[in-house]
């Protein structure tokens, strides 16, 4: 395909590689908690979006991860893919986040280690990126919203709840459901949101 990188192709999954990847995501790992892809080019770690310059709705999660990694593990730049690298459409990173709901990252490993006269070993950068991946895997539980209902009050026709989020991800589609002992749904709330960094009422 001779289209520029901002063109997603003739149709969705027009390339066999992206089609196979979407099948894998949907049929093998539909409930994954983390998705990582690797690429060579420059040294940077990218999160969604590649297609749009706006920050994702879970920007608090990605900024938290960036700050933790840069403060304690590596000085690898961590950016929104569109702003940090260039606009890029049709990536598994954007599909995994936007459609499947995974936290997703692309690790770009620069190719300077392959140049003649380089003083950096190929394994140095890869080792550092492996440390970052290890951090992401060891803390994977926190990359989702983990809601705890601290208090529920029912007064007349109103239900009030206090919710804490133990994870670092926001959610916009939490609901409160009420079932009887037979498992029959008697009532459910509208969707409500809980940010990653607050206690909601």
Where are these regions (language model features)?
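Short acidic/proline- and small/hydrophobic-mixed sequence motifs that coincide with surface turns
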Residues: 168-173
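Intrinsically disordered, low-complexity Pro/Gly/Ser/Thr-rich segments with frequent PxxP/GP/PP motifs
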Residues: 181-201
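Short amphipathic, basic-aromatic surface patches that mediate peripheral association
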Residues: 163-167
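Conserved aromatic beta-strand anchor motif in extracellular beta-sandwich/beta-rich domains
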Residues: 176-180
């Amino acid at each position: 395909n001779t289209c520029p990188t901002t063109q997603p192709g003739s149709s969705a999954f027009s390339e066999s590689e992206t089609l196979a990847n979407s099948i894998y995501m949907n049929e093998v790992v539909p409930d994954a908690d983390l998705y990582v892809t690797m690429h060579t080019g420059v040294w940077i770690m990218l999160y969604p979006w590649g297609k749009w310059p706006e920050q994702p709705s879970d920007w608090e999660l990605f900024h938290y991860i960036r700050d933790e990694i840069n403060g304690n593990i590596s000085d690898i730049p961590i950016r929104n893919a569109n702003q940090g690298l260039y606009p890029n459409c049709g990536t598994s990173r954007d599909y995994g986040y936007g459609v499947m709901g995974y936290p997703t990252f692309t690790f770009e490993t620069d190719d300077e280690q392959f140049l003649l006269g380089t003083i950096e070993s190929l394994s140095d950068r890869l080792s550092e990126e492996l440390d970052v991946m290890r951090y992401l895997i060891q803390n994977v539980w926190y990359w989702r919203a983990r809601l705890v209902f601290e208090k529920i009050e029912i007064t007349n026709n109103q239900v009030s709840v206090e919710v804490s989020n133990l994870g670092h991800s926001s959610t916009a589609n939490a609901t409160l459901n009420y079932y009887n002992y037979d498992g029959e749904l008697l009532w459910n709330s509208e969707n409500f949101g809980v940010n990653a960094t607050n206690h909601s009422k």
